[in-house]
Amino acid sequence: MSVLSGLNTKVVKNGDPAPAPPASGTIRIYNMRYCPWAQRALIFASLKKIPTEVINIHLDQKPDWFFTKHYKGQVPALEHDEGKKIVIESAVIPEYLDDIYPEPRIIPTDHYEKVQQKLLLDRISGQLSSAFYGVVQAAKISDLLKEKLVELAKAYDTAEELLTGDFYSGTSKPGFVDYLIYPNIQRAFWTSHIIKDFPLKVESFPGPNYPKLSKWYKRLDSIPEVIATSQPTETAVEFFKSWIIGAPNFDYGL
């Protein structure tokens, strides 16, 4: 049974009333079902089996009250202790959850190893996400799109090179880097169904040019905490089509 209550519920938007504080003993994550950054927090909550209430936010029509949860009005935002504590930012929330719910521990407790994981995340995630969103923004401009597709392939070349074992954690289990980069890579998988000449291939994603990443993606894609926080591929592809043309349907599939 999933610990994530409300994951597949319709968005709240401007004009909707603010929810009551989260119940004692639970956390609340403000989310958007297709957002890779919010999925980072959901994965950690699912993995640690934390009773979690999920509230989905309409990112184009944000409720005024949501800016009291995140000053930029972004997801994810974490609320707990009956609303007394709020934590924001997609790389900060997982670390916070790892500290207050330490079983199972994901981030190394050794200070040096912890720093190395954060540096690796910064190197891989920054390049992958920048290249991917560059492609999406250029999707309707053919000359620019070709340039951005080359940049995306280079970003995946780097990710392939930096994967030296089964996982970026350097252990036999996925870790901080694996869980935090997976959502953006999953969005690239969805987009590979849509954009012509996409350098990442649907079959054995991201394709034969990335043999280590293909095995890594297959491993991550089959673990319970990823399955529990992901949307069906067919649904996600249709959402991304609406997003790419600038008319995102945040409730698609509900």
UniProtKB/Swiss-Prot annotation:
It comes from the Eukaryota. GO terms for biological process: glutathione metabolic process. The active site is at C35 (nucleophile). GO terms for cellular component: cytoplasm. Residues 110-239 form the GST C-terminal domain. SUPFAM superfamilies: GST C-terminal domain-like, Thioredoxin-like. InterPro entries: Glutathione-S-Trfase_C-like, Glutathione-S-Trfase_C_sf, Glutathione_S-Trfase, Glutathione_S-Trfase_N, GST_C, GST_omega, GST_Omega/HSP26, Thioredoxin-like_sf. Keywords: Oxidoreductase, Repeat, Transferase. GO terms for molecular function: glutathione dehydrogenase (ascorbate) activity; glutathione transferase activity; methylarsonate reductase activity. Its EC number is 2.5.1.18, 1.8.5.1, 1.20.4.2. Exhibits glutathione-dependent thiol transferase activity. Has dehydroascorbate reductase activity and may contribute to the recycling of ascorbic acid. Participates in the biotransformation of inorganic arsenic and reduces monomethylarsonic acid (MMA). This is Probable glutathione transferase omega-2.
